[in-house]
Amino acid sequence: MKPGKLNWEDLKELIDENRGFQREEVVLHSGIGEDCAVINFGDYDCVISTDPITGAGKNIGKLAVNINCNDIASSGVEPIGIMVTILAPEGTTLEEIKALMQEIGEEAARLNIEVMGGHTEVTSAVNKMIVSCTIIGKGKAGTSVATSGAKVGDDIVVTKFMALEGTSIIVNDHEQKVQEFLTEAEIIEAKGFTDYLSVLEEGKLAGELGVNSMHDITEGGLLGALWEMAKASQVGFRVFEEKIPIKEVTKKICSSFNLDPLKLISSGSMLITMQQGERLVKALQQKGINAAVIGKITEGSGILVKEGVEQEVPPPQRDELFNL
């Protein structure tokens, strides 16, 4: 098999055939596009998610904390703590592990969450450092937002700019290559995108405004996230390429490496659906967060309108990052 997430058909089969015993306390179960599980504990819900970092070589501690917190943010609740598993290859020094944990601890402190535990080992089973985290959030019972809540007629809103994470990974891990076509200022700008990977603020605001659906845009990029949201909600969508916010340095990098920015890992951006999406856009912009309405939730299939031509969006394959 090639690197990357399993295709949706294989993943759905694995999920559907291996659910174990379904507990009544679990109010949001596993499914395509659902990154979180929700467990009811009376007046409050516990929201849990887990994700590894596998495609990056640098800033993996910072990335691991943010992508997991973003899953919780997409439910519109507050992250409380994180558990960290580190698998280090043979030859890793104690100083390298300490530096990684320091990065994780500093990012967790910045986001007001606690590192509650985990596991660390050196193993021949991996050839580079792997970090996998489980994040726990808390919200009032019945208030969490699901990926599967999108409704026909909803506006589709995205926050910040697409492929911030993918752009920063490429520049940090392949700096010598990008120096051939990027200026020093562009390289500094792209590296700085790691400071914009959290979607906690927009997730909290969107939850307060009563949106129908949220999904953080990660592996597979915007088109992958749209497809997953539509599949989970049993709806279609129609989005317009010219309305999708993408930084010029990202366009330049993707053009040079022949990558599609709409299929490139995009932590730092949230996909949201609701009625009167411009109301959310205005509220986000008042807090200094870029946002745009890029289309509508529809019946039928998912459509990308590109230069006036309609293209049906297929199920997501592996992320463009793995095509480098």
Which functions belong to the PLM regions below?
Residues 1-56, 75, 84, 106-108, ...:
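Extreme N-terminal cap/leader segments of soluble proteins
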Residues 3-10, 285-324:
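Acidic, Ser/Thr/Pro-rich beta/coil linker or hinge segments at domain junctions
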Residues 28-31, 47-49, 114-118, 157-159, ...:
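General beta-strand structural signal in soluble alpha/beta enzymes
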Residues 40-53, 78-175, 296:
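Glycine-rich anion-binding loops of enzyme active sites
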Residues 57-82, 102-110, 198-208, 224-228:
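Small-aliphatic-rich amphipathic alpha-helix that forms the alpha element of a beta-alpha
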Residues 89-91, 190-266:
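Active-site-proximal betaalpha loop/short-helix elements
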Residues 134-146, 184-206:
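Active-site glycine-rich loop that binds ribose-phosphate moieties when present
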Residues 273-279:
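Helix N-cap motif at beta-to-alpha junctions
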